[in-house]
Amino acid sequence: MQIHNKVFLVTGAASGLGAATAKGLIEAGGKVLLVDLAAAVEARAAELGANARGVVADISDEDAARRAVAAALETFGALHGLVNCAGVVGGEKVLGRNGPHGLDSFRRIVGINLIGTFNMLRLAAEAMAEGAPDAGGERGVIINTASIAAFDGQIGQAAYAASKAGVAGLTLPAARELARYGIRVMTIAPGIFETPMMAGMTEEVRESLAAGVPFPPRLGRPEEFAALARHIIENSMLNGEVIRLDGALRMAAK
């Protein structure tokens, strides 16, 4: 799929991976609806110009997600792509000093990372399926964001790893099911990236994390995630796969 003049919805777009992805799509000639729970998404969209619009929405809420998809259709007239970057992290042991892992905290992480991702996927797929196919029969592409924690989950990451493993596991069956509509589904599983989630860490901790990456020995850059998202969109043979973007990092147990 060519990006030029196509319409994309990017979640988690106020900062980090989502913001970089939205910027990259705009630079490639796309039109982007930026979605985030943070009100800053509106200012972010304004920075990107007339082909961008920001909408505040909770992706795990059915009505809010429907409004976001509707906003893309109303603003730009179609929907050709979804990049799900919205997500949260959290650390809690299955059995810690204060007792077992809280169910509310587990539900929150799974609710946003997995259910929120699926919520946007199903609603975007509905909109894409109603659109006209291109010359190759393609109607849309959906890119979800998992994490290497889906495969190398560490101690204290039970909820986060489970949520991201769910996103990874969703990829192939969704791709197979949506193939009849000409809609592709892919997932990127990033390693450790320079995002606002890392901002609270000391320089010493950041350097230690970077040293654990075989090559390049540094943290990933959001624009590198955005570049892979763009390639996935443009390469129609990429479908039903999870791509690790991690510099060959394999996380230890703790």
Model-derived features: positions:
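Conserved mid-core segment of classical short-chain dehydrogenase/reductases
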Residues: 88-107, 126, 130-136, 156-159, ...
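Canonical Rossmann dinucleotide-binding motif of NAD(H)/NADP(H)-dependent dehydrogenases/reductases
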Residues: 3-33
